[in-house]
């Protein structure tokens, strides 16, 4: 029997799940006109859950028969996830109304997906890992196809569902191999088993490769990236904004925990897999984005490249590498949320526009929005003194300390190549002639754009010490054993 105190480490997840169900009931009783109210209450629920998460920081607790762990690593990842959810729901409110998609189920599904993500980063067992992953995925499948009257949205949802189901099968097969050859699915028992002098069975290594492949799909790492451009382009733009941040943060944090915590002693076996995926992701992301004219497809390939940079830190397999990954994720969140806030504001005569050329002359009609977008592009490209430069600096330094010199050099070269398509957007905004005037962004979107733009340049230096210390504390918890 589970004692009452055992539920306390999972209090944020329980609160958010109850809030989602309460908001679902509220939407049912109030009807279709409740979307705005439910959305803002969902933002409030995410913020309260964030406070509950931070209140438990510094403590380490394992509960639910070893299935769930609450530690500083989970706290850091959950704060990022909840921040991403709150910001993307804020951006969605006006978009849903303008696109006639305002249904109260939308923010509820986002909250349920967030609960799944929080369970993922606190998973201490392959079974709880899968449960959290599927809770997230089932919600995301629905919101990817949320715009039922738009063929591309239905196509995006179907593609994501089919390929996501395949990746789940691959992950389950890998988990079954690990259990079959080790006799356990618990992370702590696996870590103890592999810390002995007895070499790991070949079946365990093969199972780990399958699990890594299943998780690589969730983070859009090459060669499991094929769904990303089509889903990013076809899904409603507010959904794409959510996909670009929260699920990526959760899946990559889970990827780090799985490889470093139970399988840290098998670094020699999984390091080469991560090395290849990092190189392939950086190369594909930087080269394929060059020819894109649709800004959402460009951001899809950009996200693939950025996952490659984050994997550089993971490939190091060190505490410094994990710290670099977490710092990178925090900066990546701000850059992408800000960029998609601008994309969501791209309206001409009431209709959404998605081509890069539609930003022509933006500096003349909306100079502050153009300046913010330039900040995001410079930061995504890793140009100093933007925050994105320091994100890449920490992962590359970790790779060099781990003697992965080739990986670091490839990362620097692909980062230089990626500047082409980021600077192209800056050139279009500031030097091309004004074609059509983009409408003024909604107040909520303008606040998000301004806040994230300030974060990626001046404000980052103010909070950098807190982010660095939080990431260091989170990374150290994975190396306690």
UniProtKB/Swiss-Prot annotation:
Reaction it catalyzes: a quinone + NADH + 5 H(+)(in) = a quinol + NAD(+) + 4 H(+)(out)
One annotated Gene Ontology cellular component of this protein: plasma membrane
One Pfam family it belongs to: Proton_antipo_M
Enzyme Commission number(s) from the entry: 7.1.1.-
UniProt-recorded Gene Ontology molecular function terms: NADH dehydrogenase (ubiquinone) activity; NADH:ubiquinone reductase (non-electrogenic) activity; quinone binding
Membrane topology: Multi-pass membrane protein
Transmembrane feature ranges: 9-29, 37-57, 73-93, 104-124, 126-146, 161-181, 204-224, 236-256, 270-290, 298-318, 324-344, 370-390, 404-426, 447-467
Gene Ontology terms: biological process: ATP synthesis coupled electron transport
Annotated localization: Cell inner membrane
UniProt keyword terms in alphabetical order: Cell inner membrane, Cell membrane, Membrane, NAD, Quinone, Translocase, Transmembrane, Transmembrane helix, Transport, Ubiquinone
Domain of life (superkingdom): Bacteria
Similarity comment: Belongs to the complex I subunit 2 family.
Assembly, per entry: NDH-1 is composed of 14 different subunits. Subunits NuoA, H, J, K, L, M, N constitute the membrane sector of the complex.
Protein's job: NDH-1 shuttles electrons from NADH, via FMN and iron-sulfur (Fe-S) centers, to quinones in the respiratory chain. The immediate electron acceptor for the enzyme in this species is believed to be ubiquinone. Couples the redox reaction to proton translocation (for every two electrons transferred, four hydrogen ions are translocated across the cytoplasmic membrane), and thus conserves the redox energy in a proton gradient.
PANTHER family: NADH DEHYDROGENASE
Protein name: NADH-quinone oxidoreductase subunit N
Organism: Rhodospirillum centenum (strain ATCC 51521 / SW)
Source taxonomy: Bacteria, Pseudomonadati, Pseudomonadota, Alphaproteobacteria, Rhodospirillales
